[in-house]
Regions:
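Beta-alpha junction/loop-to-helix N-cap segments that form part of ligand/metal-binding clefts
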Residues: 24, 37-47, 56-129, 138, ...
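Segments of small-molecule ligand-sensing domains
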Residues: 296-309, 320-395, 400
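Extracellular/periplasmic Venus flytrap/periplasmic-binding protein
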Residues: 124-125, 133-240, 278-285
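Extracellular/periplasmic periplasmic-binding protein-like sensory domains
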Residues: 237-316, 423
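Short beta-strand segments enriched in small/hydrophobic residues
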Residues: 22-42, 97, 165-171
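Periplasmic-binding protein-like
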Residues: 86-99, 117-119, 165-169, 217-227, ...
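N-terminal signal peptide c-region/cleavage motif recognized by signal peptidases
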Residues: 16-20
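Venus flytrap/periplasmic-binding-protein-like
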Residues: 72, 116-118, 123-126, 202, ...
Length: 426
């Protein structure tokens, strides 16, 4: 009889104790379509980092993590459908990996109290957290990137690019158009001529644009491309013998698959970046031990160290660290999206923290606040070595021109606030 009572007591206790649900970090991926070459390694890195936390650490704060995927195909309509289906899973944060999708879900995420992290993409003026309460774009945004390109050109031209001609080749979408306003302002400030050339989706046809570049003879070309557009552009630049060292892509046009198809002709091509490249980080030793060697990798495990795999890992790490902060701040392990949002708004990533995570110097230090959802806006430059088939960082991470960018962010964000009857919070 005593044994039966003990059994009943145990069962009652288990029934009364809350069952910890997984912490849900959905992946809005695109493993199909013309941009799959970029979508796959990012999604793999994102998933693998959370698998590492589950296998090595038992999750985050003792709670397991799940990473449900929803395939968007980089299609805005499908992306919105994914948002609607994923929000039923109580996600802590969404990462749409598409500027078009981001624009569509901004009002939804605010209404649904779901934070959205658009790392290095999305609506740039979302840096103003006083207006965009649930959108974060740390550690850098497109306008930081545009300024980073100009800063680098100033650096290699002894601080003077007046009279130079810079061509922008851009994907003809909300994504590709993001840097134009900033580059126009910077051209007025520094006296260079800006030429803009749109490339229609998906970017396989670019001969007319590069023939125009051959006629215009710009000193430098910068590119806001993605997917197949990038490798076509690099090949077309090689075809007209444009100097690769004068061709600088955005961070979404600076991965291995963007340059490998052109072979030796891509040597010297450059791209801005907001994080490190390569495999020389202790976290990747753990990734091999706990994830790849156990057969748990999202892919086949051979993308570790590639640019976009690393970016997926970085995005997952930043999400996980915000979740840890939310747990610490609230004393609640099974945190909510609202708690996650509050923690993201106070996130501070220091070098000491990155060292402890096995990611020393993986990215610049940055802090987030109510007023600043975009971090510090530090931008570096990487260059492709075709013979070694590797990217190398060739500049320091430098501050973008906030004298130009901050007023643009204020103007755009306040216009959004007026249109949507939003009272700035800070």
């Amino acid at each position: 009889m005593k044994m039966k009572l003990a059994t009943w007591a145990t069962a009652a206790l288990m029934a009364a104790s809350p069952v910890m649900a997984d912490l849900v970090f959905p992946s809005m991926s695109y493993r199909t379509g013309p941009f799959a070459a970029g979508g796959i390694p990012f999604a793999d890195g994102y998933a693998d980092y959370f698998t590492l936390l589950n296998e090595r650490d038992g999750g985050i704060g003792g709670v397991k993590v799940s990473v449900p995927e929803c395939e968007t195909g980089y299609n805005t309509e499908k992306g919105v459908e994914c948002y609607e289906s994923l929000k039923a899973l109580n996600p802590l944060v969404l990462q749409p990996l598409s500027t078009g999708i981001t624009y569509q879900i901004i009002p939804k995420s605010i209404a649904d109290d779901i934070p959205v992290h658009t790392m290095g993409y999305g609506r740039t003026s979302a840096k103003n957290g006083g207006v965009f309460s649930h959108i974060f774009n740390y550690p850098a945004n497109y306008w930081d990137g545009a300024s980073g390109v100009v800063n680098y050109l100033l650096e290699i031209n002894d601080g003077d690019i007046s009279g130079k001609k810079i061509a922008l080749v851009y994907h003809n979408s909300s994504y590709g158009k993001e840097p134009i306003r900033t580059l126009e302002a910077l051209s007025e400030k520094h006296g260079f001529e800006l030429v803009t050339l749109a490339v229609d989706h998906p970017g396989q046809e670019q001969k007319s644009q590069w023939l125009q570049i051959r006629r215009e003879r710009p000193d430098y070309v910068t590119m806001w491309g993605w997917g197949i557009m990038n490798q076509v552009a690099v090949q077309e630049a090689a075809n007209i013998r444009f100097p690769m060292e004068n061709f600088i892509g955005v961070w979404w046009a600076g991965a291995q698959h963007d340059v490998l198809p052109a072979g030796a002709a891509a040597d010297g091509y450059k791209a801005i970046t907001f994080h490190a490249v390569g495999t020389d980080y202790p976290v990747f030793d753990d990734m091999r031990k706990y994830v790849v060697d156990k057969g748990l990798a999202a892919g086949n495990g051979d993308q570790i160290g590639t640019v976009l795999y690393n970016r997926g890992v970085y995005a997952a790490m930043l999400a996980a660290e915000a979740a840890k902060d939310a747990q610490a701040a609230t004393g609640v392990a099974d945190i909510t999206s609202s708690m996650m949002r509050d923690a993201m708004e106070k996130l501070s990533i220091t070098e000491d923290r990155m060292v402890a995570l096995g990611m020393p110097n993986f990215g610049p230090e940055f802090t987030v606040s109510c007023e600043n959802h975009g971090g510090n806006g530090l931008v570096g430059v990487a260059q492709w070595d075709a013979s070694a088939q590797e990217w190398n960082i060739i500049s320091d991470f430098k501050q973008s021109d906030q004298d130009v960018i901050s007023p643009l962010i204020k103007d755009d964000s306040m216009a959004f606030a007026a249109e949507n009857a939003i009272e700035p919070r800070c």
